Amino acid sequence: MGLRPQLAAILLCLLACTGNWTLGCHHGALKEIIHILNQVTEKGTPCTEMVVPDALSARKNSTEKDLICRASQGFRKFYFQHEVTLCLKNNSRVLKDLKKLYRGISSLFPQKSCNVNESTYTTLKDFLESLRRIMQKKYWQCGSSTF
C-alpha cells in the first residue's frame, strides 16, 4: 500500500521543521547568543563595569526557563531610551549587541513575565559571563561541543 504522496510530504515537512527544536535545543539561537556574549565580554569592551540587577542570582531554586526569562528581562530595559546609560548611548555597538541578546534569549523560551530580583546587583560583565556559562552548558547538553 504505502503512504499517499501528500501524507509523505507533510510528514517530511514536519520532521524537517521540528528537527532543530527538539527538547528545547535551539542550536542556531544558542550559537548566536554565545557568539555575541563572547564579543561583549572581550577585554576592553566599554560599559561592562556598569551595575545591573543580578537577574541570575538564586539559581539553585530556579528552572532553566526561569533563568532564561530573567536574563531576557534584564536585557529588555535596554530597549527603553530612559533606561539606557550615557555610556551605552556613546557606545552604540555595545547597545546593539545587548538588544540582539534580548531578542535571541527571549526567542528561546518566550514568556510574558517573570520576577527579577532587583535587591542585588552585579556588574554587566559578571552578568554576561554568568549568562555565557549557562548558555554554553545548555548548548553542550544539546549534544554539541563547538564552544
UniProtKB/Swiss-Prot annotation:
GO terms for biological process: B cell activation; immune response; interleukin-4-mediated signaling pathway; negative regulation of inflammatory response; positive regulation of DNA-templated transcription; positive regulation of macroautophagy; regulation of immune response. It is found in: Secreted. GO terms for molecular function: cytokine activity; growth factor activity; interleukin-4 receptor binding. GO terms for cellular component: extracellular space. Keywords: B-cell activation, Cytokine, Disulfide bond, Glycoprotein, Growth factor, Secreted, Signal. Residues 1-19 form the signal peptide. Disulfide bonds join 47-87, 69-114. Glycans are attached at residues 20, 61, 90, 117. Coiled coil: none annotated. InterPro entries: 4_helix_cytokine-like_core, IL-4, IL-4/IL-13, IL-4/IL-13_CS. PROSITE patterns: INTERLEUKIN_4_13 (PS00838). Participates in at least several B-cell activation processes as well as of other cell types. It is a costimulator of DNA-synthesis. It induces the expression of class II MHC molecules on resting B-cells. It enhances both secretion and cell surface expression of IgE and IgG1. It also regulates the expression of the low affinity Fc receptor for IgE (CD23) on both lymphocytes and monocytes. Positively regulates IL31RA expression in macrophages. Stimulates autophagy in dendritic cells by interfering with mTORC1 signaling and through the induction of RUFY4. Belongs to the IL-4/IL-13 family. This is Interleukin-4. It comes from Mesocricetus auratus (Golden hamster).
